[in-house]
Amino acid sequence: MSQDVNELSKQPTPDKAEDNAFFPSPYSLSQYTAPKTDFDGVEHKGAYKDGKWKVLMIAAEERYVLLENGKMFSTGNHPVEMLLPLHHLMEAGFDVDVATLSGYPVKLELWAMPTEDEAVISTYNKLKEKLKQPKKLADVIKNELGPDSDYLSVFIPGGHAAVVGISESEDVQQTLDWALDNDRFIVTLCHGPAALLSAGLNREKSTLEGYSVCVFPDSLDEGANIEIGYLPGRLKWLVADLLTKQGLKVVNDDMTGRTLKDRKLLTGDSPLASNELGKLAVNEMLNAIQNK
């Protein structure tokens, strides 16, 4: 007989691999994860056949987020937020390259993997080698960016690990600058928009000032995520708060699966937006190719 969900512990689960580190509580995982996503099919299977244009994914290489109370949250990129949008893009015909800041392996929140979702699992299996041995972002900038680059979009998935390092990276800043200067897409969701903070590094104002975005609600990270034991403490800073201070317009204060297009910036509010953001990215990229 299955355990009643209300009997599940709201205490974060210790991660024995690190001192004072914790995974989300059993109760929080019962609320936030599921064996399947809302994937309802690919709209443009094989639509892109030329083989030139690719996606550059900037993924997380650090697992632990240090919190205000000294505890660490054991996190990574959220597998649905990473793999479901990529499923749509890859099925449409776009190849994907994976990069991390230092070239170290990508970290995933495997506890959020929808183990019965064929779209997500098949994409994970196709990308597993690249996730284990990603490119170093600085090398990508040096050798593969420029006006003639084959990358049509930069994709930054979420998961709380996106708040570690990526928001303070000059390499991420250079990559976003390149995308803006060369009319390429920037696609991100949930906590991934933390990367957009790099656009304001050492500048009087962000190059993304005035853009509108969807992002994971600060109110959940300050409230419910702590109350149900998803987080073992308060984050040192909040993504939507800092984006707003840089002059971006956060359009949501809840988690509904909302997506948004502002020029070439495509954003989603949470894992719930993964499916629709993937569709949006494919549609926008195909339209851009037709108009080139």
Swiss-Prot record:
Transmembrane segments: none annotated. Disulfide bonds: none annotated. GO terms for molecular function: glyoxalase III activity; protein deglycase activity; thiolester hydrolase activity. Its main location: cytoplasm. InterPro entries: Class_I_gatase-like, DJ-1/PfpI, HchA, Prot/Nucl_acid_deglycase. Residues 1-12 have a biased composition (Polar residues). The keyword DNA damage applies. It catalyses: N(omega)-(1-hydroxy-2-oxopropyl)-L-arginyl-[protein] + H2O = lactate + L-arginyl-[protein] + H(+); N(6)-(1-hydroxy-2-oxopropyl)-L-lysyl-[protein] + H2O = lactate + L-lysyl-[protein] + H(+); S-(1-hydroxy-2-oxopropyl)-L-cysteinyl-[protein] + H2O = lactate + L-cysteinyl-[protein] + H(+); N(omega)-(1-hydroxy-2-oxoethyl)-L-arginyl-[protein] + H2O = L-arginyl-[protein] + glycolate + H(+). GO terms for cellular component: cytoplasm. One of its GO terms (biological process) is DNA repair. Its EC number is 3.1.2.-, 3.5.1.-, 3.5.1.124. Pfam families: DJ-1_PfpI. SUPFAM superfamilies: Class I glutamine amidotransferase-like. Keywords: Cytoplasm, DNA damage, DNA repair, Hydrolase, Stress response. The keyword rRNA-binding does not apply. It is found in: Cytoplasm. The active site is at 190 (nucleophile). Protein and nucleotide deglycase that catalyzes the deglycation of the Maillard adducts formed between amino groups of proteins or nucleotides and reactive carbonyl groups of glyoxals. Thus, functions as a protein deglycase that repairs methylglyoxal- and glyoxal-glycated proteins, and releases repaired proteins and lactate or glycolate, respectively. Deglycates cysteine, arginine and lysine residues in proteins, and thus reactivates these proteins by reversing glycation by glyoxals. Belongs to the peptidase C56 family. HchA subfamily. This is Protein/nucleic acid deglycase HchA. It comes from Staphylococcus aureus (strain MSSA476). The lineage of its organism: Bacteria, Bacillati, Bacillota, Bacilli, Bacillales. The gene is hchA.
